[in-house]
Amino acid sequence: LRRLAAALESIWFEELQADGQLTGAFQPIVNASDRRTAGYEALLRARRPDGTILSAAEILRAARALDRITTLDVRARILALEQAKKHELHGLLFINFTPSAIDDPTTCLQTTWAVAERLRIDPGKVVFEVIESESLTNLRHAADVLAAYRQRGFRVALDEIGSAHSGLVWLSALQPDFVKINRQLTAGLAAVVTKRAIVAKLAELCRQIGARTIAEGLEDEADASVAVELGVDFLQGYPFGHPQIPEQMSDS
């Protein structure tokens, strides 16, 4: 039964890629100062023939089980660039990024660079967002991968600061252009003194090292307003827009 399940999962995963079922969902990121859209985070989704939408977690789980995470990582990156260009999503484009999925930074970079060049996308507008929990196993490798991307003009964000004790170590080693403050700190920010103190210090620290901060996972205006007061540069969350596939964005 286990072998049968693995075989079925493999067929399902191959169909996702071959049949054009993979798509992006884009969530706005807004300036804290005026609430205007500064860019979008590209999130991976899959649209099944019956119309149901699969989350990134479901897709990634299958990719890991089948040892296809590298293939998926490259495909997701190209897809985000192509859809952002096709649907004229202006501003910064944040693309989730898994350094551990990359064996050869130079080859991977060349693929991404070629797509950006073909689409005439300014690499300075593309931000590769390192998911901290995905990258804790090899700090040196992550730094090497990101250094290669920076040399071509791409920028780097560190995601989920505040979700693990090692976050400050990664902040020091990777020196990101943007830092995302985890929803564990932003949820209930207006009501919890301790969270406000931590977010204020993180915002100050990031300013000192030249990184701009994004409060993610915001669910109400009260928390968003406090984040602005504490010096956060950008806001992301449901008050400013849910993740939407391109067709939904065109209809809204």
Where are these regions (language model features)?
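Surface-exposed amphipathic alpha-helices with a cationic face
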Residues: 117, 143-155, 200-207, 228
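Short glycine-centered, acidic/aromatic-flanked micro-motifs in structured strand/loop junctions
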Residues: 28, 44, 97-99, 130-132, ...
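Catalytic core of bacterial c-di-GMP phosphodiesterases, primarily the EAL and HD-GYP domains
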Residues: 70-141
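EAL-family c-di-GMP phosphodiesterase catalytic domain
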Residues: 1-5, 36, 46, 131-136, ...
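Active-site core of bacterial EAL-family cyclic-dinucleotide phosphodiesterase domains
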Residues: 2-62, 243-244
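Short acidic-capped amphipathic helix/loop micro-motif used as an active-site/signal-coupling element
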Residues: 48-53, 77, 81, 160, ...
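Short, conserved glycine- and acidic-residue-centered signature motifs
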Residues: 73, 142, 195, 199
